[in-house]
Amino acid sequence: MIQKNWQELIKPNKVDFITHGSRAHATVVAEPLERGFGLTLGNALRRVLLSSLRGAAVTAVQIDGVLHEFSSIPGVREDVTDIVLNIKEIAIRMEGEGPKRMVVRKEGPGVVTAGDIQTVGDVEILNPEHAICTLDEGAEICMEFTVNTGKGYVPADRNRAEDAPIGLIPVDSLYSPVRKVSYKIENTREGQVLDYDKLTLNIETNGSVTGEDAVAYAARILQDQLSIFVNFEEPQKEAPQEQVAELAFNPALLKKVDELELSVRSANCLKNDNIVYIGDLIQKTEAEMLRTPNFGRKSLNEIKEVLASMGLHLGMEIPAWPPENIEDLAKRYEDQY
């Protein structure tokens, strides 16, 4: 009864991921959804996508000859404030955890771009064409960047360490790899019902993560956060018991002859004649058994006595023997004989 609260709600029978020629843009379409669930899920996913996914960003910069962000640099057209604003827009992918250091050195004339930055092994600049500043003839600039990982938006004053050296300028850090998210809700049909929701999410990232992966991470975050509110255990479905097909012969015939507690001589004779199962044995006649090397009348009588105690005898005919899956059948029926 309880599980009907969620089991009988309709769930999307398909989720389409549409790329637009790059990692940075994607459209996600999910349908059908219960009426109102498009807005519920769309709004929740959008908020998590924008605020809660981890990424990498520049947290501070140190420029040779500059003591604070209100300085100007000879031969550089932009002042330090504008340079810092441009640094904030550098898109970075970093595999490991920070902090890491990056350096750029360049002489003018020319434009200093993000592609001029010398990165370490697990740091990648995703928008190398992004302009940082412009140098005049004879001008030179050297900057060292601190890169770290985090989530959301962290203002510059929180990136300022108490023991920061003079000249280290903190930078506002936008860690989120997701730049824009929008969604729309449309009507869709399922069978004869016309008032279900269709959710379309449009996602733009900085390229460090695909739109499809970003949605997957956001959904996982929501799943983890909501699980704490579930205060009951779901009833377990009983697995249907496997139906064992009836055999065309006595299951005791699947027992191996080495379990019959025969004398060593008799057991060795059967082994040498490739008689493995009782079903193999009882199909033999007395004459066939006596033709077995080293098999005498004493061994024959011993075997006849053991078989008689099981209601069996030599020379029996068994339909459908040996079965193709004899080893599997022997394991399945071993508790029944």
From Swiss-Prot:
It catalyses: RNA(n) + a ribonucleoside 5'-triphosphate = RNA(n+1) + diphosphate. Residues 249-337 are annotated as: Alpha C-terminal domain (alpha-CTD). Residues 1-233 are annotated as: Alpha N-terminal domain (alpha-NTD). It is an enzyme of class 2 (transferase). Keywords: DNA-directed RNA polymerase, Nucleotidyltransferase, Transcription, Transferase. GO terms for cellular component: cytoplasm; DNA-directed RNA polymerase complex. InterPro entries: DNA-dir_RNA_pol_insert, DNA-dir_RNA_pol_RpoA/D/Rpb3, DNA-dir_RpoA, RBP11-like, RNAP_asu_C, RNApol_insert_sf. Its EC number is 2.7.7.6. GO terms for molecular function: DNA binding; DNA-directed RNA polymerase activity; protein dimerization activity. DNA-dependent RNA polymerase catalyzes the transcription of DNA into RNA using the four ribonucleoside triphosphates as substrates. Belongs to the RNA polymerase alpha chain family. Homodimer. The RNAP catalytic core consists of 2 alpha, 1 beta, 1 beta' and 1 omega subunit. When a sigma factor is associated with the core the holoenzyme is formed, which can initiate transcription. This is DNA-directed RNA polymerase subunit alpha. It comes from Brucella ovis (strain ATCC 25840 / 63/290 / NCTC 10512).
